[in-house]
Amino acid sequence: NIYCRLYERNFLEALDDLRTAVEILHAAGKKAYVSTYAAPLTPDLDQVRRVLEVAATSQADAVEVHNLGVLRIVAQEFPSLRVHMGAFANVYTDLTARKFVELGATRITPNYEVSLSETDLINSRVPAEFEILLHGKMPLGVSESCFLLTGASTLGLSCPEACQEEYFLHYEDWELKSLGKGVTSGRDVCMLEHIPHLLARGYRVFRIETISETPAYQSEVGRVYADAIARAESGQWRIKEEWWDVLRPHSSHGFCNGFYFGRSGRLYISANGAGATQPA
């Protein structure tokens, strides 16, 4: 969990577990990426260094960094680590992305408010991989204050159990999901229909956002997209209805496309460009 050090069972605090997780992934032939905290404070940096040391000695394939100070620590103290800039690095322009590359980053995640056309422009000007969110609740903000504990006594919540449950913030037909110190979209970004379009534009690095989601969500949604990407790459693209049958139960508040198409982040735009409340 990149939002809170007190989150229960957080690998970033249980370093032996983190080391074991990297070993298990490598033994299974998988890559292991270690994310760091989205908004670490100065007192947190010693723990961040310990996390980076485990990542380096375990030969993690990369570390995800959201903070310029953490990027500096990696560059100066753990230069063997490959660096990916995460969504909270606030990459809105090609100049920002280029500066991160100059400091050692090899992969960039543009801020999720950046449209796909703007991402294309940045991508054309910066020599790095660019990561695209394919599915999942879009991270929108992070704070040092825990929203859930603000009303803990009224709601009967305590830490660290509070954020193990799902909490949605509603206003009329808008919804956001609260993770305590983080907030995400209430609807799941869903770019399933647009995979051939993304591949044609040259993107090859994709993300499924699964913070606070169940293991079933992670495995079943991941399997759908692995199948979809393989079909698109083979030239035999066709949407399978069973894909929607898997995805819909995991997205209780529906789908959206985020800000990829320059529209409101809660809308869903189909592959033919037509706006729709939800996929047909």
Language model region names:
Residues A105:
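Residues lining hydrophobic/aromatic ligand-binding pockets adjacent to catalytic sites
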